[in-house]
Curated annotation (Swiss-Prot):
This is Vacuolar protein sorting-associated protein 29. One of its GO terms (cellular component) is endosome. It catalyses: O-phospho-L-serine + H2O = L-serine + phosphate; O-phospho-D-serine + H2O = D-serine + phosphate. Zn(2+) 2 binds at N39, D62, H86, H115. It comes from Dictyostelium discoideum (Social amoeba). One of its GO terms (molecular function) is metal ion binding. Belongs to the VPS29 family. Its EC number is 3.1.3.3. It is a peripheral membrane protein. The gene is vps29.
Length: 183
């Protein structure tokens, strides 16, 4: 089962759109779920995600005007509970201890957050933490030099294979991390 973690797109205010190098990889009917950390800013990106899969979960970013998106969301997929938040609620932004506190509060196996626009995937105390970065490379308050990125997760039983996609100098680079759910 394929899950895309993506966010901080900022179209049209900070970016023209998802890079074509990524769009070639995001094929309809191959992806079962999209978990988005927000800051889409425009309806255009939401509609694009719905073309990829009907199962799209989005939380509200600090710049999203769509107030129907929740601040946090829990999604059960297979044997895993995924928690989703934009990340502007985490103080300081991206702080691992604060992320772990939210993970415990939501009682999830995987916490997906954004806001920093910096890709980060790590394990802590048997839990998986994913920040997919910015899919468009939109600048942030932290950095003007943001590498476009997103994360693909392949969920099989109690395993998640995490594929990290980065667009560097016009080339898509992929890294892989394996995570096993602790019982």
């Amino acid at each position: 089962m394929f899950i895309i973690a993506i966010g901080d797109v900022h179209v049209p205010h900070r970016s023209y759109g998802i890079p074509p190098e990524f769009k070639k990889l995001l094929v309809p009917e191959k992806i079962q779920h999209i978990l988005c950390t927000g800051n889409l800013v425009s309806k255009e990106i939401h509609d694009y995600f719905k073309v990829l899969t009907s199962d799209v979960h989005i939380v509200r970013g600090d710049l999203d005007e769509n107030t129907s998106y929740p601040d946090t969301k829990i999604v059960s997929i297979g044997q895993f509970k995924f928690g989703l938040c934009h990340g502007h609620q985490i103080v300081p932004w991206g702080d691992r201890a604060s992320l772990a506190a939210l993970q415990r509060q939501l009682d999830v196996d995987v916490l997906i957050s954004g806001h920093t626009h910096v890709l980060e995937v790590f394990e802590s105390n048997g839990k998986l933490f994913v920040n997919p970065g910015s899919a468009t490379g939109a600048f942030s308050n932290i950095s003007n030099d943001v590498i476009p990125s997103f994360v693909l997760m392949d969920v099989q039983s109690n395993n998640i294979t995490v594929y990290i996609y980065k667009l560097i100098d016009g080339q898509v680079k992929v890294e892989k991390i394996d995570h096993v759910k602790q019982q």
